[in-house]
Structure formats: structure tokens, C-alpha cells
């Protein structure tokens, strides 16, 4: 493969990282070495905690710079825009945008848009939308989660889902509401692309990191899919959340074959909403 093809492939992988890794969950595979002693999932206690307290709310906005090594590749944002009612269900409306910068636009332009509507009390997904604009590729898809009847409803099909199923965006918000203890792995049911993928969020350690937005004491987590077949490429995603009640993501790092990528928090606005105890349904309590 000549240098130009290698470069173009690398750019496409960067774009894919921005699209799929930014608050999606890159499959790490249970056999990969994370660099942490005893990091295999078998060494973690599997837990299924319910949400305890919600410290985020409308108005929270996180802005990340995406880097591939020393190369600035683009930006990604994640914002809780409003409270929305969907079929009488109160939800958080979360919008995530990812885009390559002008330099990368010349080679492979990305303007992707994901939306998640998260149940206000049970913190599971009610609807997930993705609107992909990647080079000449365009795709729009919406899935509605009928959590009562355990169905993911697409325009042309219905798929059975486990109770309390998450999409890739809602999964992160759920994790932010539960207690995270080192040595434990939080189990989440996840659905994407017409298939169900269990996720185990390993809680690795505590450490301090510095990003453009400042220095933060963090708890380090690593989400792992039970199967690695969801993506063609494999990489390990590590996420640094603030080690406080808010659990704000400040750094995401993914190692893949061609190098490593980082999403580093550069700006943030926290919500002025008061912390609250979510009113978990009886069904949700029974299944967790």
C-alpha cells in the first residue's frame, strides 16, 4: 500500500473514531491487555446498580478536541438540550455532534449528529437517532425503545431487547448516576444496529489528569463489549470521569492498530439543575 493510501486510510480511521468512539463504546475485547494488572473481566465483580442520584441536567454542555497523536482532527460536543415528552414519557434530550476540522474536510469530511432521549427517572433509552454525513456517505436511522414490551422499533422491523436497554449515549449518562468502585464492572444492556450487545464497564483506578479545561481528579473506567464483532476494527476505549458526584467525562483515549486517539475536554458548562433522586419504576428495580 502506497503512502497516500495509508494516509487516507488513517484519516478515515480518525473520522470513524470521531463518529463511533465519541461516547460510543469501542469494543475492547476481553482478551486485550489494558495495561492494568488483573484487568481481565474475570477479575472484576459484576454489579447491576440502579441510579442513585442525578447531578446532570438541562444546560450541561461538554466540548472536546479530538486528537490523533499530535494532530488535531476535529471537535465533538455533547449537550443536554431540553426536557422532551415522548408518548407521555419525560426524557432528557441529549445531542452529540462530531465534525472534522477544515484540514481533514479536504480529505474526508465528517458532520455527524446523534440524539438520545433518556427516560427522566429510569435513565434508559427511549429513542436514539443517528444522522451520518461522512464523505459521500449518508445515513439516517431512528430506533424507538419500547421498554415496557421489550422491543426496539425501527422503520422496517422490530427487535426484542433486554429490560433497561441503553443506546451508546444513554449508557454513559447511566454510568454517571451509579456508584463506581474499583474492582467492579457495571453491567449494562445495550442495543445498536438491530443487535443487542451487553456492556461491562470496568472501574480501574483513580488518578489525576490535565486537559485543556483544567486539572481533574478522576476515576478511570473501561467499557468492554461482550463480543467484539460490532466493529470491523478493534480498539480499547478508556474514559476518565471526574471523581465526584457529577462524574463528568474529561478524557477519552482509544488505542487502535495505527496509533491512539484522544478526546480532551476543552470547554464545559454544568447544569444549574438541582441534584435529584430518580424515581425508579418497580419493573426496573425488579430486573436490576
State what each model feature region is.
Residues 1-2, 169:
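Helix-centric, low-specificity signal for extended rod-like, repetitive segments
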Residues 3-14:
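Bacterial N-terminal signal peptides that target proteins for export
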Residues 4-5, 172, 281:
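General helical secondary-structure elements
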Residues 12-13, 98, 163-164, 230:
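Alpha-helical interaction segments
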Residues 13-22:
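Bacterial N-terminal signal peptides
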Residues 25, 33-145, 180-288:
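Acidic, serine/threonine-rich low-complexity disordered tracts
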Residues 135-177:
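Hydrophobic, well-structured mid-protein blocks that either form specific transmembrane helices
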